[in-house]
Design a protein with these regions (language model features):
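Non-heme di-metal
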Residues: 1-304
């Protein structure tokens, strides 16, 4: 049996879990409306009153974090398309992907409307960057459906943390509320994806661990096609919104602990090797974090 066939067989084996996780999500998540949060009363016509930097009320670093997070959300069509690669329209996972896409769609609406009404971004640059980002496209390094769920479990947790931290750095109650709402949604989505991976681990630990080691070992946030991504990501890292240390301590290590990866037994040689790679990954990330922090202390972190 090919790896694709094995992966799809595993997906079919956890379909009942998927249904239960989706029902739990619908019961748990509180629906919200972005238009109730956005400060419309601050809005002014950009044609009559063009934007200028002194109108901004947030620091340049916080504005960078909010804009980068927004542009990452703008790539939603590509994230949705990843599900269509693996699942037919009648699959419960396609049903989930439509629900997830509908909920995710409000995130960009909320962040963009806040930034525009509060004049905390250059509207022309923001729109040009959105167009460039979407035209660039995004294709995740996911060969199988198992890869998809290992990636989304880590990515949704990482995105939750990035949104929450960006809001916490903002000297504005509305910005914090917007980002906290978005982060709460990401947490609900993370719980779903983590649950799918948990079910897969129960059914086939070897296949799931092999995929997990590959995905976590080469993990990238889905925003690398954004204009000036490296410079913006470094600014966010320096601000403490998201960096290697945060990725290690708030994403990788908690997930590996939750899944008890270090204590899984009865593995084949393939699973055992993947298990070893995952445990070693934490040491590798620690080294990367220490190097970044040393460079930051010496002010040698390049922005371009």
């Amino acid at each position: 049996m090919s790896i694709q066939a094995e992966a799809m067989a595993l997906v079919e084996a956890v379909e009942s879990d998927v249904r239960g996780l989706m029902d739990a999500h619908l019961e748990r998540r509180e629906h919200w409306y972005a238009h109730e949060i956005v400060p419309w009363e601050l809005g002014r016509n950009f044609r009559d009153e063009p934007w200028s930097p002194e109108q901004a009320t947030l620091s340049p670093e916080v504005r960078t974090a909010l804009v980068l997070n927004l542009l990452t959300e703008d790539n939603l069509p590509y994230y949705h398309a990843q599900f269509q690669v693996f699942f037919g329209p009648d699959s419960p996972l396609s049903e989930w992907s439509r629900l997830w896409t509908a909920e995710e769609g409000q995130h960009a609406i909320a962040i963009r409307n806040y930034l525009l009404t509060s004049r905390n971004c250059d509207p022309d640059v923001l729109e040009d960057d959105r167009v460039a980002t979407v035209r660039k496209g995004w294709v995740g390094a996911m060969d199988t459906a198992i890869d998809l769920f290992n990636y989304t479990a880590a990515q949704e947790l990482a995105t939750r943390i990035s949104h929450r931290n960006a809001g916490a750095k903002a000297d504005c109650g509305v910005a914090r509320e917007v980002m906290n709402r978005v982060a709460a949604d990401e947490n609900h989505h993370f719980i779903f994806y983590r649950g799918v991976v948990t079910a897969m681990l129960d059914q086939s630990p070897d296949l799931t661990l092999e995929s997990m080691a590959k995905v976590m070992g080469g993990f990238e946030m889905p925003g690398t096609g954004i204009p000036q991504f490296r410079r913006r990501a470094v600014e966010m890292a320096k601000l403490g919104v998201y960096n290697v240390r945060i990725h290690l301590e708030n994403v990788v290590s908690p997930l590996l602990r939750y899944w008890k990866v270090d204590s899984l037994t009865g593995l084949t040689s393939v699973g055992a090797k993947a298990q070893e790679r995952l445990m070693t990954l934490q040491d590798d990330l620690t080294t990367q974090a220490e190097k970044f922090e040393a460079r930051l202390a010496g002010k040698k972190v390049r922005l371009a």
